[in-house]
Amino acid sequence: MIVVSCLFSCQKTQLTATQILSRSLEAHGGIELWQKVDTLSFTKKTILYNQDGVEEKELTQHQSFYGDNFINGEIISIGADMSRISILGGIYSKSIGDSLTFLTNDDVALIKKSFRSAYYVISQPFNLRESDALLTYKKDTILNGEKTFVVDVSYKENQNSNASDQWTYFFNAKTFLIVAAKVFHSPTISFIENIKFNKETPFAFNAERESIFLNKDGSKDYLRASYLYSNYKVVFKNN
């Protein structure tokens, strides 16, 4: 269930937050088609930078989500020390190389959080529709020379892995694609811009993104990360 509140500025645009989301769902492929997906997999490359703009770390992962509500899946980190975490039928596992790792309760919680965070990112805007999200239309703004709708998102505590984070989404006013997001994850504020989209499947997924750390006044601090997505594969349910 989505609860929507709207500020007076909604009257100016004649669109509510829920209407903006509905159009974004269609622009990204449609909620009905999304609910028919059985398996979603892709490759994600992350490059981290320090404050001087020097590459700090590079990580390539193959992520897969499948089953009802995508509660099953695996995340494989590719490299010299290949690691794998998975959730299969409620069973949590982690391996490094060919060796399985004994999991503590903290390890299980970390794996669960990693999966929820990864799914949260890749499933937008559909997750905004499926989750118990509170959407608040905030204003119009200009982003990269184009009109953009700004919508704040919050969650009820203990009902979403990102409940403690404060999210704001930016929807292009013409295409209704999500073109950026801002998140306050104490103590940092990040502005994540969707630079390119992948439309090789029936959906408009992320292809290239950049995450910029912001100062408290909202000004740019430095580029923290770039993300490249590729090799998307979607398998639909038989029925």
Residue ranges, per PLM feature:
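C-terminal motif of bacterial Sec signal peptides marking the signal peptidase cleavage site
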Residues: C6-S9
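Gly/Pro-enriched, hydrophobic low-complexity segments
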Residues: E146-N239
